[in-house]
Amino acid sequence: MEYDVVIVGGGPSGLATAIRLKQLDPELNVCLLEKASEIGAHILSGNVFETRALDELLPNWKELNSPIKTKVSKEKFLFLGKTKSLSWPTWLLPAVQQNHNNYIISLANLCRWLAEQAEALGVEIFPGFPASEILYNDDGSVKGVATQDMGIDKEGNQKDSYEPGIELLGKVTVFAEGCRGHLGKQLIEKFNLSDGKDPQ
């Protein structure tokens, strides 16, 4: 299958990328692969969410039935010891650590909602299709990904439900797997992307 853009990963970054691409060029063929059975299934974290990026991506997000509803009403900053804690006044914290006007959200629900927005723009989303292999052109550039075969037993034999993996080719492939993505690690090694870099 051929696309203009193939996105690997259905978290906030991958979904925001898909949305922005379709906003900029509605004619682009964009697909997004997510390894989980549904968008948000592997996003288990809660979050204190600052909306600036969402305000830029979807300025009318409040009108789109977003799951972002609960504003931070109170916060504390504590230094924790073995037996005691020390409270620190929040007004002494740097602005980036203050949560005034931020929201308390479920990242899973945010991702599900972002997926709805992406699909409404024409993004094709394929949950339950983990990308298992990076595909390369002869010149070494990335040309897409392949999904893993389905219906394989523990010994590696094909079951009756076997379906071969598919190749998704893109003029551009975006890897948005998160910091522990196995394909991203392969790219970092192949192209020496971490040489001379601080991991933070």
Task: For each feature predicted by the language model, list its residue ranges.
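N-terminal FAD cofactor-binding segment of flavoenzymes
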Residues: 35-84
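Glycine-rich, phosphate-binding/catalytic loops in enzymes
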Residues: 24, 47-50, 190-193
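Conserved Rossmann-like nucleotide-cofactor binding loop
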Residues: 13, 38, 180
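Predominantly flavin-linked oxidoreductase catalytic cores and closely associated redox partners
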Residues: 112, 117-200
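N-terminal Rossmann-like FAD-binding beta1-loop-alpha1 element of flavoenzymes
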Residues: 3-31
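Short, hydrophobic/amphipathic alpha-helical packing segments
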Residues: 12-18, 108-115
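Short, solvent-exposed loop/turn and secondary-structure capping segments
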Residues: 42-44, 89-90, 185-188
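Helix-loop-beta segment of a Rossmann-like dinucleotide-binding subdomain
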Residues: 86-107, 116, 144-146
